[in-house]
UniProtKB/Swiss-Prot annotation:
Protein name according to UniProt: Mesencephalic astrocyte-derived neurotrophic factor
Upper classification of the organism: Eukaryota, Metazoa, Chordata, Craniata, Vertebrata
Subunit record text: Interacts directly (via SAP domain) with HSPA5/BiP; the interaction inhibits ATP binding to HSPA5/BiP and subsequent nucleotide exchange. Component of a complex containing at least CRELD2, MANF, MATN3 and PDIA4. Interacts (via C-terminus) with ERN1 (via luminal domain); the interaction is decreased in the presence of increasing concentrations of Ca(2+).
Family: Belongs to the ARMET family.
Modified residues (Phosphotyrosine): 76
Protein function: Selectively promotes the survival of dopaminergic neurons of the ventral mid-brain. Modulates GABAergic transmission to the dopaminergic neurons of the substantia nigra. Enhances spontaneous, as well as evoked, GABAergic inhibitory postsynaptic currents in dopaminergic neurons. Inhibits cell proliferation and endoplasmic reticulum (ER) stress-induced cell death. Retained in the ER/sarcoplasmic reticulum (SR) through association with the endoplasmic reticulum chaperone protein HSPA5 under normal conditions.
GO biological process: ATF6-mediated unfolded protein response; dopaminergic neuron differentiation; neuron projection development; regulation of response to endoplasmic reticulum stress; vasoconstriction of artery involved in ischemic response to lowering of systemic arterial blood pressure
Organism: Homo sapiens
Gene from which this protein is expressed: MANF
Amino acid sequence: MRRMWATQGLAVALALSVLPGSRALRPGDCEVCISYLGRFYQDLKDRDVTFSPATIENELIKFCREARGKENRLCYYIGATDDAATKIINEVSKPLAHHIPVEKICEKLKKKDSQICELKYDKQIDLSTVDLKKLRVKELKKILDDWGETCKGCAEKSDYIRKINELMPKYAPKAASARTDL
């Protein structure tokens, strides 16, 4: 009887050691988290900020005020926005204070809230080459939204195209100068 238990125990231990427990992040996982926290960490280093958890927490809240789109959603998930439901911001500030790589921090955040690593950046439209007339109104609205602009009074697709062409030199000067159809 003991021999059977020992054999079964050994089999279970072997199976657990072979099965992947906490997998490391695969390429492309936590794209927004790694990119955003990486920029945040670099910003702190560039400004010679004191690396204490309290300071980092305050700086992250300030940094998140400027965040838009998916990055704002990340800030919401970690509790760095005013309207956040949960506060796991200390899961970022404490490890960052000890200079733990952002990949490891995001991996730990993934275990707390899997939504954090499901965030992906939207595919960017190359404004220098795209034919705006072939885009859908939804995509045209998205371009304006990414710039923080709206098109009041726009009813037709041509209205959105006109507004984008009007604002392109301000928000995408390289694309505006590369375009020949303006």
